[in-house]
Amino acid sequence: MQIDLNADLGEGCGNDEALLALISSANIACGWHAGDAATMVQTVKWALARGVAIGAHPSYPDRENFGRTEMQRDPEHVYADVLYQIGALDAIVRAQGGVLHHVKPHGALYNQAVRDPALARAIVRAVRDFDADLVFFGLAGSQMIDVAKEAGLRVKQEVFADRGYNADGTLVRRGTPGALHEDEEVALDQTLTMVREQRVRAIDGTWVPIRAETVCLHGDGAHALAFARRIRERLGAEGIAIRAGD
């Protein structure tokens, strides 16, 4: 058995180089919610040195709120936004001799696309039009994944180690009870259950089927690095290999 571990990097958290030793895929901020050209260049350099798969992490234009504020943005504008950000990171990756592997939307853009098919189609169209060989990372079991598949893209269904789930398989909204697992043991147990049993316990106590193909480890928490080490060790002890795959 194998699983991909991904983390959102280039966001100014100061632990990117160390995290890259523990993950298999990196989602690099493209300057619209965090980071800038210099951080993109440096993060790509570190990722290439570690052999980590590199992905673009496009967002709404929202540096003030770290891309976590929902916007009512025209789908054509979103298409252009995402296309622009993918192109910027791709140029940096190519300049250093690498190849862009995937795209994962960030924050509010990601969460809204789970609920809004027009938004999901705009994001997916930008990815496909840029390079139809890119892998699309999206919330496991969501319509965002369905839209990407319908467009002919390869997908990785993403689960979250430290986030709470609703009974419909969506993430509990940040700022509400149960949104984040502060207890590392709870997060570790949830991750192992999702990977091995392909299910997750929702906040109402029900079990929800879930397809875990890549696990997101948030890189911006106070204990992100220590948790990443623990989850890697726990997966290894269970005989689960960590690789990006195709």
Curated annotation (Swiss-Prot):
InterPro entries for this protein: Glyco_hydro/deAcase_b/a-brl (IPR011330), LamB/YcsF/PxpA-like (IPR005501)
CDD domains reported for this sequence: LamB_YcsF_YbgL_like
The enzyme's E.C. designation: 3.5.2.9
Record GO terms (molecular function): 5-oxoprolinase (ATP-hydrolyzing) activity; ATP binding
BP GO annotations: carbohydrate metabolic process
Record's catalysed reaction(s): 5-oxo-L-proline + ATP + 2 H2O = L-glutamate + ADP + phosphate + H(+)
Keyword annotations: ATP-binding, Hydrolase, Nucleotide-binding
Tree of life domain: Bacteria
First-level EC class: hydrolase
Cross-referenced HAMAP family: PxpA
Family assignment from sequence similarity: Belongs to the LamB/PxpA family.
Function recorded in the entry: Catalyzes the cleavage of 5-oxoproline to form L-glutamate coupled to the hydrolysis of ATP to ADP and inorganic phosphate.
Oligomeric form and interacting partners: Forms a complex composed of PxpA, PxpB and PxpC.
Protein name: 5-oxoprolinase subunit A
Lineage per the UniProt record: Bacteria, Pseudomonadati, Pseudomonadota, Betaproteobacteria, Burkholderiales
